[in-house]
Protein backbone atom coordinates (compact mmCIF):
# COMPACT_ATOMS: atom_id res chain seq x y z
CA UNK A 1 0.00 0.00 0.00
CA UNK A 2 1.33 3.44 -0.90
CA UNK A 3 2.05 6.02 1.77
CA UNK A 4 -0.77 8.22 0.44
CA UNK A 5 -3.23 5.33 0.58
CA UNK A 6 -2.08 4.65 4.13
CA UNK A 7 -2.72 8.30 4.95
CA UNK A 8 -6.29 8.04 3.67
CA UNK A 9 -6.99 5.11 5.97
CA UNK A 10 -5.84 6.95 9.07
CA UNK A 11 -8.60 8.28 11.32
CA UNK A 12 -9.98 11.77 11.59
CA UNK A 13 -9.17 12.98 15.10
CA UNK A 14 -11.85 14.93 16.97
CA UNK A 15 -11.54 16.45 20.43
CA UNK A 16 -13.77 18.37 22.79
CA UNK A 17 -13.85 19.19 26.47
CA UNK A 18 -16.45 16.48 26.99
CA UNK A 19 -19.37 15.10 25.01
CA UNK A 20 -20.61 18.06 22.95
CA UNK A 21 -18.23 17.24 20.11
CA UNK A 22 -20.16 14.04 19.53
CA UNK A 23 -22.65 16.12 17.54
CA UNK A 24 -19.79 16.73 15.10
CA UNK A 25 -18.98 13.00 15.07
CA UNK A 26 -22.65 12.31 14.36
CA UNK A 27 -22.48 14.53 11.28
CA UNK A 28 -19.17 12.95 10.22
CA UNK A 29 -20.76 9.50 10.41
CA UNK A 30 -23.74 10.69 8.37
CA UNK A 31 -21.82 12.50 5.63
CA UNK A 32 -18.47 10.65 5.62
CA UNK A 33 -19.48 7.14 6.69
CA UNK A 34 -16.33 5.44 5.39
CA UNK A 35 -13.99 7.55 7.48
CA UNK A 36 -12.33 6.13 10.57
CA UNK A 37 -12.88 8.43 13.55
CA UNK A 38 -10.98 8.77 16.83
CA UNK A 39 -12.71 10.93 19.44
CA UNK A 40 -11.22 12.28 22.64
CA UNK A 41 -13.39 13.88 25.30
CA UNK A 42 -11.45 15.61 28.07
CA UNK A 43 -14.17 14.80 30.58
CA UNK A 44 -11.87 15.11 33.60
CA UNK A 45 -11.47 18.83 32.92
CA UNK A 46 -14.84 19.81 31.48
CA UNK A 47 -16.06 22.52 31.00
CA UNK A 48 -13.58 24.61 29.03
CA UNK A 49 -16.05 27.47 28.68
CA UNK A 50 -15.44 28.84 32.19
CA UNK A 51 -11.63 28.57 32.15
CA UNK A 52 -8.96 31.13 31.26
CA UNK A 53 -7.60 31.38 27.70
CA UNK A 54 -4.20 30.15 28.92
CA UNK A 55 -5.72 27.05 30.53
CA UNK A 56 -7.90 26.27 27.52
CA UNK A 57 -4.87 26.56 25.25
CA UNK A 58 -2.79 24.22 27.43
CA UNK A 59 -5.56 21.62 27.59
CA UNK A 60 -6.08 21.87 23.83
CA UNK A 61 -2.38 21.34 23.13
CA UNK A 62 -2.43 18.21 25.27
CA UNK A 63 -5.56 16.87 23.57
CA UNK A 64 -4.01 17.51 20.16
CA UNK A 65 -0.79 15.74 21.16
CA UNK A 66 -2.83 12.71 22.15
CA UNK A 67 -4.50 12.60 18.73
CA UNK A 68 -1.21 13.17 16.90
CA UNK A 69 0.37 10.24 18.74
CA UNK A 70 -2.54 8.12 17.55
CA UNK A 71 -1.54 8.98 13.97
CA UNK A 72 -4.67 10.79 12.87
CA UNK A 73 -4.64 12.42 9.42
CA UNK A 74 -6.82 15.44 10.18
CA UNK A 75 -7.97 17.12 13.38
CA UNK A 76 -11.33 18.69 14.16
CA UNK A 77 -11.38 20.98 17.19
CA UNK A 78 -15.02 20.24 18.00
CA UNK A 79 -15.21 22.73 20.84
CA UNK A 80 -16.19 26.34 20.25
CA UNK A 81 -14.20 27.58 23.25
CA UNK A 82 -11.03 25.78 22.14
CA UNK A 83 -11.60 26.92 18.55
CA UNK A 84 -11.92 30.52 19.73
CA UNK A 85 -8.99 30.56 22.12
CA UNK A 86 -6.51 27.87 21.05
CA UNK A 87 -6.85 27.07 17.34
CA UNK A 88 -4.23 29.57 16.10
CA UNK A 89 -1.68 28.17 18.57
CA UNK A 90 -2.49 24.59 17.55
CA UNK A 91 -2.10 25.42 13.87
CA UNK A 92 1.34 26.92 14.52
CA UNK A 93 2.53 24.02 16.68
CA UNK A 94 1.29 21.06 14.68
CA UNK A 95 1.79 20.27 11.01
CA UNK A 96 -1.41 18.26 10.58
CA UNK A 97 -4.34 19.90 8.79
CA UNK A 98 -7.01 20.94 11.27
CA UNK A 99 -10.19 22.92 11.48
CA UNK A 100 -12.25 24.48 14.24
CA UNK A 101 -15.99 24.98 14.40
CA UNK A 102 -16.13 28.78 14.40
CA UNK A 103 -15.09 29.70 10.86
CA UNK A 104 -17.52 27.28 9.15
CA UNK A 105 -20.36 28.60 11.30
CA UNK A 106 -19.44 32.23 10.71
CA UNK A 107 -19.24 31.80 6.94
CA UNK A 108 -22.55 29.93 6.85
CA UNK A 109 -24.24 32.73 8.80
CA UNK A 110 -23.15 35.25 6.18
CA UNK A 111 -24.63 33.10 3.44
CA UNK A 112 -27.89 32.74 5.36
CA UNK A 113 -28.56 36.29 6.51
CA UNK A 114 -30.77 38.60 4.47
CA UNK A 115 -30.73 41.69 6.67
CA UNK A 116 -27.12 41.38 7.93
CA UNK A 117 -28.23 41.03 11.55
CA UNK A 118 -26.73 37.87 13.03
CA UNK A 119 -27.12 36.46 16.53
CA UNK A 120 -24.66 34.10 18.20
CA UNK A 121 -25.26 31.98 21.30
CA UNK A 122 -22.57 30.00 23.09
CA UNK A 123 -20.73 29.39 26.35
CA UNK A 124 -19.39 32.19 28.50
CA UNK A 125 -15.87 31.54 27.18
CA UNK A 126 -16.84 31.56 23.53
CA UNK A 127 -18.93 34.72 23.80
CA UNK A 128 -16.33 36.52 25.92
CA UNK A 129 -13.69 35.77 23.28
CA UNK A 130 -15.66 37.68 20.63
CA UNK A 131 -14.37 35.20 18.04
CA UNK A 132 -17.57 34.96 16.01
CA UNK A 133 -18.10 38.71 15.90
CA UNK A 134 -14.50 39.42 14.85
CA UNK A 135 -14.57 36.84 12.08
CA UNK A 136 -18.00 37.79 10.75
CA UNK A 137 -17.13 41.50 10.69
CA UNK A 138 -13.78 40.79 9.03
CA UNK A 139 -15.69 39.09 6.21
CA UNK A 140 -18.51 41.66 6.02
CA UNK A 141 -18.13 44.87 8.02
CA UNK A 142 -21.72 45.87 7.20
CA UNK A 143 -23.11 43.16 9.48
CA UNK A 144 -24.39 43.63 13.01
CA UNK A 145 -23.49 40.77 15.35
CA UNK A 146 -25.23 40.29 18.70
CA UNK A 147 -23.81 37.64 21.04
CA UNK A 148 -25.42 36.19 24.17
CA UNK A 149 -24.04 33.47 26.49
CA UNK A 150 -26.44 30.64 27.34
CA UNK A 151 -24.68 28.73 30.15
CA UNK A 152 -27.71 26.66 31.22
CA UNK A 153 -28.08 25.06 27.79
CA UNK A 154 -25.09 22.74 28.34
CA UNK A 155 -26.31 21.11 31.58
CA UNK A 156 -29.84 20.88 30.18
CA UNK A 157 -28.57 19.03 27.10
CA UNK A 158 -26.40 16.71 29.16
CA UNK A 159 -29.28 15.88 31.49
CA UNK A 160 -31.52 15.06 28.55
CA UNK A 161 -33.76 18.09 29.04
CA UNK A 162 -34.03 18.99 25.38
CA UNK A 163 -37.66 20.11 25.23
CA UNK A 164 -40.63 20.95 27.41
CA UNK A 165 -41.87 24.04 29.25
CA UNK A 166 -38.81 24.48 31.49
CA UNK A 167 -36.37 24.37 28.56
CA UNK A 168 -38.60 26.63 26.49
CA UNK A 169 -38.77 29.22 29.27
CA UNK A 170 -34.97 29.20 29.64
CA UNK A 171 -34.63 29.59 25.87
CA UNK A 172 -37.03 32.54 25.84
CA UNK A 173 -35.06 34.33 28.56
CA UNK A 174 -31.81 33.88 26.62
CA UNK A 175 -33.10 34.50 23.12
CA UNK A 176 -35.54 37.39 23.57
CA UNK A 177 -32.81 40.07 23.76
CA UNK A 178 -31.41 38.73 20.48
CA UNK A 179 -34.80 38.59 18.81
CA UNK A 180 -35.54 42.16 19.92
CA UNK A 181 -32.58 43.36 17.82
CA UNK A 182 -34.18 42.01 14.64
CA UNK A 183 -31.75 39.20 13.84
CA UNK A 184 -32.72 36.91 10.97
CA UNK A 185 -29.91 34.37 11.52
CA UNK A 186 -28.82 32.61 14.72
CA UNK A 187 -25.55 30.70 15.08
CA UNK A 188 -25.62 27.77 17.51
CA UNK A 189 -22.13 28.49 18.80
CA UNK A 190 -21.77 25.43 21.02
CA UNK A 191 -21.70 21.78 19.97
CA UNK A 192 -24.21 20.92 22.71
CA UNK A 193 -26.87 23.16 21.21
CA UNK A 194 -27.99 20.97 18.27
CA UNK A 195 -29.79 18.83 20.87
CA UNK A 196 -31.88 21.89 21.69
CA UNK A 197 -32.42 22.92 18.09
CA UNK A 198 -36.16 22.17 18.05
CA UNK A 199 -36.97 24.33 21.06
CA UNK A 200 -34.59 27.09 19.92
CA UNK A 201 -36.24 27.11 16.49
CA UNK A 202 -39.69 27.27 18.05
CA UNK A 203 -38.77 30.22 20.27
CA UNK A 204 -36.87 32.03 17.51
CA UNK A 205 -39.70 31.60 15.02
CA UNK A 206 -39.78 30.82 11.30
CA UNK A 207 -38.20 34.11 10.25
CA UNK A 208 -34.88 33.21 11.92
CA UNK A 209 -32.50 30.77 10.21
CA UNK A 210 -30.49 28.54 12.56
CA UNK A 211 -26.86 27.77 11.70
CA UNK A 212 -25.70 24.43 13.13
CA UNK A 213 -21.91 24.67 13.47
CA UNK A 214 -21.57 20.87 13.62
CA UNK A 215 -23.19 20.48 10.20
CA UNK A 216 -21.21 23.33 8.69
CA UNK A 217 -17.92 22.05 10.09
CA UNK A 218 -18.40 18.62 8.54
CA UNK A 219 -19.11 20.23 5.16
CA UNK A 220 -15.78 22.04 5.49
CA UNK A 221 -13.99 18.85 6.58
CA UNK A 222 -15.28 17.00 3.52
CA UNK A 223 -14.08 19.79 1.23
CA UNK A 224 -10.63 19.87 2.81
CA UNK A 225 -10.20 16.10 2.69
CA UNK A 226 -10.97 16.16 -1.02
CA UNK A 227 -8.57 19.03 -1.69
CA UNK A 228 -5.80 17.25 0.25
CA UNK A 229 -6.63 13.87 -1.34
CA UNK A 230 -7.14 12.36 2.11
CA UNK A 231 -10.70 11.13 1.80
CA UNK A 232 -11.18 7.41 2.47
CA UNK A 233 -13.46 6.65 -0.45
CA UNK A 234 -11.90 3.64 -2.16
CA UNK A 235 -14.33 0.95 -3.31
CA UNK A 236 -13.10 -1.61 -0.77
CA UNK A 237 -13.54 0.70 2.20
CA UNK A 238 -16.54 -0.26 4.29
CA UNK A 239 -18.03 1.70 7.15
CA UNK A 240 -15.33 3.38 9.19
CA UNK A 241 -14.17 2.34 12.64
CA UNK A 242 -15.04 4.64 15.56
CA UNK A 243 -13.05 4.75 18.79
CA UNK A 244 -13.87 6.87 21.81
CA UNK A 245 -11.43 7.96 24.52
CA UNK A 246 -12.11 9.98 27.67
CA UNK A 247 -10.06 11.24 30.58
CA UNK A 248 -12.67 10.38 33.23
CA UNK A 249 -15.80 8.28 33.93
CA UNK A 250 -16.25 6.20 30.76
CA UNK A 251 -19.62 4.80 31.90
CA UNK A 252 -21.17 8.26 32.21
CA UNK A 253 -19.77 9.21 28.82
CA UNK A 254 -21.43 6.16 27.25
CA UNK A 255 -24.78 6.91 28.85
CA UNK A 256 -24.99 10.62 28.10
CA UNK A 257 -22.95 10.54 24.89
CA UNK A 258 -25.37 8.17 23.23
CA UNK A 259 -27.96 10.96 23.13
CA UNK A 260 -25.50 13.27 21.39
CA UNK A 261 -24.34 10.62 18.93
CA UNK A 262 -27.86 9.40 18.20
CA UNK A 263 -26.88 5.77 18.85
CA UNK A 264 -25.42 3.68 21.68
CA UNK A 265 -21.70 3.95 22.39
CA UNK A 266 -20.69 0.38 23.08
CA UNK A 267 -17.08 0.89 24.15
CA UNK A 268 -15.25 3.84 25.68
CA UNK A 269 -11.55 3.74 26.53
CA UNK A 270 -10.28 5.50 29.60
CA UNK A 271 -6.95 7.31 29.31
CA UNK A 272 -5.08 6.77 32.59
CA UNK A 273 -3.34 9.90 33.83
CA UNK A 274 -1.80 8.36 36.95
CA UNK A 275 1.86 8.07 35.93
CA UNK A 276 3.01 9.19 32.47
CA UNK A 277 1.45 12.33 31.04
CA UNK A 278 -1.69 10.94 29.47
CA UNK A 279 -1.01 12.42 26.04
CA UNK A 280 2.30 10.50 25.83
CA UNK A 281 0.63 7.12 26.17
Positions of predicted regions on the chain:
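Non-catalytic structural scaffold of enzyme domains
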Residues: 2-281
Amino acid sequence: MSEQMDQRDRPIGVFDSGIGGLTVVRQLMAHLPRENILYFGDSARVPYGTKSPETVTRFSIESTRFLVRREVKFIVVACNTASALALPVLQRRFELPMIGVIEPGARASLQATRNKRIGVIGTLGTIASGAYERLILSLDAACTVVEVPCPLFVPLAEEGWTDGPVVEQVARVYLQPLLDTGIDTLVLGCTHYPLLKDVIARVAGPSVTLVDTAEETVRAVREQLEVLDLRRNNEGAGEGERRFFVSDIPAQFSQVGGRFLGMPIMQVEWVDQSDLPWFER
